Amino acid sequence: MATRSAKIDQKADLIWAIADKLTGVYKPHEYGDVILPLTVIRRFDCILSDTKDAVLQKYDEVKNLPMKDILLRKASKKDFYNTSKYTFERLMDDPDHIEENFREYLNKFSANVRDILEKFKFDGHITTMANKGILYIVLKEYTTDRGNLHPNEISNLEMGYIFEEIIRRFSESHNEDAGQHYTPREVIQLMVNILFYDDNDILSGNNVAKTIYDPACGTGGMLSVAEEYLHSLNASTELVSFGQEINDQTFAICKADMLIKGNNAYYIKDGNTLSDDQFAGSTFDYILSNPPFGREWKNEKAKVEEEAKLGFGGRFGAGLPAASDGQMLFLMTAISKMKDIDKGGSREICTAETEREACDNRRKVW
């Protein structure tokens, strides 16, 4: 599996240092709310720079056509695009209208990127920085060498590591709930190694396509590490990631991370897995997850009980756990979505010790 280099840590340090410009306006634990989305936007800006003129020309030709989204993606050679005349560098030419121009620039991104920014709730930060007179200053930092995130400078894999490091620092600054969306990389690597250990089809086959699902994907660490590890073993294999996340910000981070690395983010969905399953009726080759433990499911009670009436026609045919045991519902979700073993299905769930004890007790009852 690929390892990090000093270059990655240095770049992450440089990007995080931009937060110095936020001092006084934001508290230290709020820096990530600005740095994360801005880093995503800047990376997209750099990625699209090489095809910017081609996209603008194509937009003039197809802006009134119903198929324009497909044509613009083709012009950008990416899964996203921007039809604004602005780039970060061009925004610097007009400091007096930075807020207006920056908003216009963001609004011209494709819908998948706008969805990420909406989930980041970034619009309010634009207003705050503009009102406090630091918006231009902060954006300008991203046009210096420290903010150079062009693919010629930083590969997709390196950018993924840099983004991961910024996420880690952000999680530490929110240490009261960091565990909800950050699973240590070494834990994920161990799980992934076990998951693929004896799967000869995916390890040695040519042009094999498999699916992987995480019902509580958080920032997408498990899905990303699984893809990265598999490609290091067999570059011809395609692993399509499916995930759902309830928290808006962690969903935005996950979807952004997928796009940053050049992966397909279409199947990363937001919403409550227990009450609003975005992949109802679907099954997957692999399931890898670290669902939240100690979480009550009383808020989802009505929807869960309604689905339980379907028996094994739904996810909860084995019966419902105690109201305090939401993790068991995630476990049943994973089991219901696993392909049969004879069709290659495999799963791995990271659970708390208390959950295993609870399972033992339930087996005695059942």
What are these regions (language model features)?
Residues 1-199, 267-278:
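Non-catalytic, mostly N-terminal accessory regions of nucleic-acid modification and defense proteins
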Residues 48, 230, 234, 338:
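Active-site catalytic pocket residues across diverse enzymes, especially alpha/beta-hydrolases
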Residues 15, 21, 30-40, 191, ...:
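Conserved Class I SAM-dependent methyltransferase catalytic core
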Residues 181-289, 294-306, 351-353, 364:
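Conserved S-adenosyl-L-methionine
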Residues 10-17, 39, 157, 161, ...:
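Generic recognition of stable, solvent-exposed alpha-helical segments in well-folded globular domains
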Residues 293-296, 300, 306-324:
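Conserved catalytic motifs of ABC-family nucleotide-binding domains
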Residues 19-20, 148, 172-178, 212, ...:
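Glycine- and acidic
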Residues 128, 152, 216, 243-247, ...:
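Hydrophobic alpha-helical scaffolding
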